[in-house]
């Protein structure tokens, strides 16, 4: 439960649900003295216990089952145990150059680090450098309107309104109504994540609504909202995506962080 009031006349009461059921399975080979792990394929969500209802329609078939808005923790734990054991017999990846195909359960981290943090305007301005440093996506690149952040097929957006997402709320911690906006459009850098006291720098009159404090006693400041890769125009299966990859690695889940 979050209650917000300010001297401008805002009185906002929000009931916010968040859940992240998580685990790590460790398989030990006592003869070799080695161990392998496999983490859960769950996701942090803006949902309640209904996320654990394990509905069949939320299961995504593949080399391992992945999950949408409902998660089967027992099924995933059993698969994790088997796959952790299988990793003991797996070959190491040979050094070299590979094409990568990243499942959303892994891609989220790539987006978080390579797009989310660099496009936090406080890092761009040098106000913040904790953990993820400052940013290469400087204001001159944005002002040029031609900085290629990614391939022209790539569209990335920020929001705090996707139903069921971890960052979804009605209003941020400055009392600003949340919304969605573009960060990268057709591969070009078009915007940042910014709050009320930063918007004049971007020539905008309205905050993006991504201000956050982790506690009533903490000072709220600009924090990363949901940052997402927009789907492509073609609805491709994994098999269709990888059929043209001659030397590549397909990654599901994350075994480490940045």
Named regions from a protein language model:
Residues 1, 94-107, 159, 163, ...:
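A glycine-rich phosphate-binding loop feature that marks nucleotide/adenosyl-phosphate handling sites
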Residues 1-20:
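Hydrophobic alpha-helical hairpins/lids featuring a short glycine-rich hinge
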Residues 4, 92, 173-176:
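Short, glycine/acidic-rich beta->alpha junctions
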Residues 4-5, 78-82, 161:
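Short linear interaction motifs
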Residues 15-19, 94, 148-150, 221:
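A short, structural micro-pattern
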Residues 16, 70-77, 81, 149, ...:
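Generic structural signal for well-ordered, non-membrane alpha-helical segments
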Residues 18-123, 191:
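Internal alpha/beta scaffold segment
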Residues 57-60, 129-258:
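Dual-mode signal for accessory low-complexity, basic/Gly-rich regions
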